């Protein structure tokens, strides 16, 4: 099968996140199964326009801001003649409206849609543009098969007018052979960790406020990730007088991420909406409980009271209480962590890739 994937970024882009990791893990495995995969994405400064990433032939065009305007033209000039069996729009950020491209077989892969949450991240004009860009989905994509990474995302699509019978839910995976527990690395004092981008809509401020409410002398909060909201978060840390206890690590390599997760008593996530929450599953694979907002997508990657705790969104006090529960009963860290590891082992990238390939074969045969 010859496959073209459209996504704003590839996994090596400095702005890459969970969607790009998902793309790489799934489609590199599909390549390994003997299929051909091209990726059309945006470029950035001082990188080649063509590159091969684990068998995926990557075409880069434009920038993060110009990609949606240039992608269709590049496709028509350079890729349309390749006679792809199926084209996949990894539909995130602003839709590319691929049903208007004249593609024969199309699948829309969705992690999550922004909806009103766009107004928590961007200026009102930009947020309004994102919100409006999602409005035509039901009309333009009404005959397009969808692949969603969670039931929450599928429900969101249905609420927007997509027929449920057109949606296939295929959960993300995690590399449990690389992400493994090591109790010897667990910190003797409470460490809470956030791993992810520092964007306003991620609500890392809730995590910081929750940690500040813990008011425990030997506890620390370690924040790993980059983003344009770091400075305001650092200001919040200073204003709450917890600067000595909060470390901003910036970008950390994969091995350091694993050591951080093993060291932590819990990984903490306060996003009001995610497609799934890959970082939760990575923590679970390392035998680390998760404290997370009971938000769409996220709630499917944590079993409340078994692999961690779900708390009401935008509620620092509830998150503080969950943190305090682990501090007061340290044995819970090991109990929840062991259950989290077993939970993570049920999600593999091999399963996700095979289910995706089966879905694509069904679409091509239809």
What are these regions, as identified by a protein language model?
Residues 125-149:
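Membrane-proximal helix-turn-helix segments that form the acceptor-binding/catalytic region
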Residues 147, 183-213, 222:
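Conserved donor-binding/catalytic core segment of Leloir-type glycosyltransferases
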Residues 152, 173:
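Carbohydrate-associated surface elements
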Residues 234-252:
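Nucleotide-activated donor-binding/catalytic signature segment of Leloir-type glycosyltransferases, i.e.
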Residues 272:
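Aromatic "clamp/platform" in nucleotide-sugar-dependent glycosyltransferases that forms part
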Residues 289-292, 302:
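Short hydrophobic beta-strand element within catalytic cores of glycosyltransferases
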Residues 304-305, 309-316, 325-330:
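Conserved acidic donor-binding segment of nucleotide-sugar-dependent glycosyltransferases
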Residues 318, 325, 332-346, 358:
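A short, well-ordered alpha-helix in the C-terminal region of glycosyltransferases
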């Amino acid at each position: 099968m010859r496959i073209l994937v459209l996504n704003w970024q590839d996994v090596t882009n400095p702005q890459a996140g969970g969607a790009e990791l998902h793309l790489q893990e799934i489609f590199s495995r599909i390549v390994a199964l003997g299929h051909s995969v091209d990726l059309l994405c945006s470029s950035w400064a001082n990188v080649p326009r063509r590159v091969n990433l684990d068998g995926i032939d990557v075409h880069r065009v434009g920038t993060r801001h110009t990609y949606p305007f240039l992608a269709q033209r590049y496709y028509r000039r350079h890729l349309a003649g390749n006679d792809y069996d199926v084209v996949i729009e990894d539909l995130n950020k602003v839709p590319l409206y691929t049903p208007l491209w004249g593609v024969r077989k199309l699948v829309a892969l969705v992690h999550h849609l922004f909806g009103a949450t766009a107004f928590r991240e961007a200026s009102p004009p930009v947020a309004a543009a994102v919100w409006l860009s999602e409005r035509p989905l039901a009309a333009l994509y009404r005959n397009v098969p969808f692949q969603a990474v969670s039931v929450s995302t599928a429900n969101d699509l249905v609420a927007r007018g997509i027929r449920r019978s057109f949606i296939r839910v295929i959960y993300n995976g995690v590399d449990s052979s690389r992400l493994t527990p090591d109790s010897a690395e667990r910190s003797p004092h409470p460490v809470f960790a956030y791993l992810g981008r520092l964007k306003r809509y991620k609500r890392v401020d809730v995590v910081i406020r929750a940690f500040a409410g813990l008011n425990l002398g030997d506890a620390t909060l370690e924040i790993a990730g980059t983003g344009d909201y770091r400075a305001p978060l650092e200001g919040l840390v200073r204003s709450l007088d917890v600067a000595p206890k909060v470390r901003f690590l910036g970008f950390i390599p994969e091995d350091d991420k694993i050591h951080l997760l093993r060291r932590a008593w819990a990984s903490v996530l306060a996003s009001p909406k995610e497609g799934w929450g890959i970082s939760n599953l990575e923590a679970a694979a390392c035998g680390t409980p998760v404290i997370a907002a009971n938000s769409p997508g996220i709630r499917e990657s944590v079993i409340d009271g078994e692999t961690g705790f779900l708390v009401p969104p935008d509620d620092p006090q509830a998150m503080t209480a969950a943190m305090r529960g682990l501090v007061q009963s340290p044995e819970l860290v090991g109990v929840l962590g062991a259950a989290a590891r077993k939970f993570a082992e049920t999600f593999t990238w091999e399963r996700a890739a095979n289910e995706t390939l089966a879905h694509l074969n069904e679409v091509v045969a239809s």
